[in-house]
Amino acid sequence: MAAGSWLKTHGVYRQLARRYPPETRDLCAAAQVLFELFVSAPTLSLADIYGGKMCAALDRQHPRDLYDMRLLFANEGLTPQLRRAFVVYLASHDRPMHELLDPQFKDIAKVYAGEFAGMTREEVPVAALCETRERLVTEIRKNLDADEKRFLVSIKRGEPEWDALGIAHLRELPALQWKLQNIGRMEKGKRKTALEKLQKTLNM
């Protein structure tokens, strides 16, 4: 690194328990060269990492999150395991599910200029990140399978079908239990409206 440069890291507190077993990963080759060190450490699975990032990209629409999505599409892509993890994060999210699946796109130009431009080795224009955002929404809605849709609707009904996704410990996840408690407190008319909006978004 150049003299006088600095590295900023973010510590993220995660309320949500992991969906898949952790993995041990080595520091990538480029970072080993840049920082002149080697590290191997246990991490969340790729599906858990990107499942949460997908929700963040749809919710905040921050250029950093959209850049991560661009890297995902350029490498692993939206795998079935990653998509399943995303569905669980989506079901656990504070925002209504239909709002993340069909988001109102924000103008990110100012945030891009003030909080992202110059952060990456490869210059990525704001237009490319907006294209990634559109692709993310399209890919998710096109590829959600019947079991994933059924699980999301069952959560919104307050009658979870825990076996729908084939993930063993879903009923033990605190975030899902908290979401179900909140749904249970909703007035019946509002819950019905929210369910109908989700079903419409999912084309059910």
Where are these regions (language model features)?
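Compositionally biased terminal segments of proteins
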Residues: 1-204
